[in-house]
Amino acid sequence: MQLQVMNSPFNQEQAELLNRLLPTLTESQKIWLSGYLSAQSVSAQEAAGTPAAAVSAEAPAPAVSKEVTVLYGSQTGNAQGLAENAGKQLEQSGFQVTVSSMSDFKPNQLKKVTNLLIVVSTHGEGEPPDNALSFHEFLHGRRAPKLEDLRFSVLALGDSSYEFFCQTGKEFDQRLEELGGKRISPRVDCDLDYDEPAAEWLEGVLKGLNEAGGGSAAPAPAAASQTGESSYSRTNPFRAEVLENLNLNGRGSNKETRHVELSLEGSGLTYEPGDSLGVYPENDPELVELLLKEMNWDPEEIVTLNKQGDVRPLKEALISHYEITVLTKPLLEQAAQLTGNDELRELLAPGNEENVKAYIEGRDLLDLVRDYGPFSVSAQEFVSILRKMPARLYSIASSLSANPDEVHLTIGAVRYDAHGRERKGVCSILCAERLQPGDTLPVYVQHNQNFKLPKDPETPIIMVGPGTGVAPFRSFMQEREETGAEGKAWMFFGDQHFVTDFLYQTEWQNWLKDGVLTKMDVAFSRDTEEKVYVQHRMLEHSAELFEWLQEGAAVYICGDEKHMAHDVHNTLLEIIEKEGNMSREEAEAYLADMQQQKRYQRDVY
């Protein structure tokens, strides 16, 4: 709708300006602007001496505010951050909002909820995050109530390079509908680059709620003051200077593990033990050169990166902005549509899912253009189908109390051969081969409330962290040493060889000597004829370990999810079953209760 001068208080120039501006605004921006103008109007009336009551007496009565419950299931903190942001924006729009982790929400309260927003990630092979497990199980069980009076919407987070993309969100969405719920707005599935789709989802939610008469069209006036403040974040990373970059493994090791120390001086960034650091890496320039050569593209050609119109030379864009080392089914589908390649279309034909899965595994963009190209498309067309470079999350290996203005990382270099070529981890090999002291890395802190030391410093802790999984426990120990925590601490560490792969060995020995660490058990799998892993050491001490659990100890696991964390989980169940004289079902309930009490926490990948 065009604003006309004849039916408005604006002159011709003002009307033209507004007609150019309004179509470019999103729904949430319009809502914010409405609240801002309302606040300005009230302020002007008060400054002129007009009582606020007189102003409100002439205004129409605001719509009755309705309650909205926002539940999140989050493993690394992304879903939690989006849920909290949604809560703030809803409050500014006049809603009464409760934001909660699914693990803290009492399922028997669900029947009382009128408007429900679900923000949830998918973990591992299509599984819910740890703090969503109990709610997911309840909702899919026999005790789930009928929800005919519920209105809901789901924001699903995932990674399209995995087979079960956004599976948990899809399951919540389907189940809530089966129980009688009606959608406020359609489910939105987000890939790694989730900012824009998440914002569009929230716009749809606000529109749906407001159309139902649930909230005011304007946010609270306080929103008007929330401008001009900027902090370093995932969308505005801080360039941290590299202070140290050392190889932790000894000569002759099969592994290369980097200890990287970064300066946070001047950033204002803070973190707690258990948090992660997001790092935006760059692609290997050699791989980019091969890709440019294969496609016969001009490296200096200017390409547009985003809807905002930011531009870069093609080579720079491929190095720093786009993901080129991972193939996904959506990427293949877009490439087939863009290029019209018959062979690629044949690969993607219905019923050919297993072949697609096999092709994607271990291949990158260079493989795609070599196998099915070169494509007769422009560089701009091709980069438009690529995902933005995702950040890599690393468990922080330091305590801010012990290392002011610094953050330390423990990064395992990834190298392997596949499909006739050497493959390299994007971020890990940047750190191993190209990153020097004095260089900078774009970083941000990812807070993780699902992996935190006990509030009571006297609570015993049991830590299981083989390989680079040791990182957060170095942070835990530094923090406990700084604060003088007196609770018992037991560490299980494992790797290949004692001589070359005992990461931070001297530090662990000093903590043992000083009493900061009570016990440490290690497993070096290649030093014995029969491979020994951390779960074997746990079984050897099953009676004492169960005693610690009975005393209220908190258990922390960090590292590989697919094998190690799965095996350790089953070992814990075995120990509880054996030492507690329980059935398997009782042991599972015991561990689930620990998880509910935040005494069983995992940082797995």
Curated annotation (Swiss-Prot):
Component of the sulfite reductase complex that catalyzes the 6-electron reduction of sulfite to sulfide. This is one of several activities required for the biosynthesis of L-cysteine from sulfate. The flavoprotein component catalyzes the electron flow from NADPH -> FAD -> FMN to the hemoprotein component. Transmembrane segments: none annotated. Residues 213-234 are annotated as: Disordered. Its EC number is 1.8.1.2. It catalyses: hydrogen sulfide + 3 NADP(+) + 3 H2O = sulfite + 3 NADPH + 4 H(+). Pfam families: FAD_binding_1, Flavodoxin_1, NAD_binding_1. The gene is cysJ. Residues 68-206 form the Flavodoxin-like domain. InterPro entries: CysJ (IPR010199), CysJ-like_FAD-binding (IPR003097), FAD-bd_FR_type (IPR017927), Flavdoxin-like (IPR001094), Flavodoxin/NO_synth (IPR008254), Flavoprot_Pyr_Nucl_cyt_Rdtase (IPR001709), Flavoprotein-like_sf (IPR029039), FNR_nucleotide-bd (IPR039261). One of its GO terms (molecular function) is oxidoreductase activity. Alpha(8)-beta(8). The alpha component is a flavoprotein, the beta component is a hemoprotein. Binds 1 FAD per subunit. This is Sulfite reductase [NADPH] flavoprotein alpha-component. Its cofactor is FAD; FMN. It comes from the Bacteria. FAD binds at R392, L393, Y394, S395. GO terms for biological process: cysteine biosynthetic process; hydrogen sulfide biosynthetic process. GO terms for cellular component: cytosol.
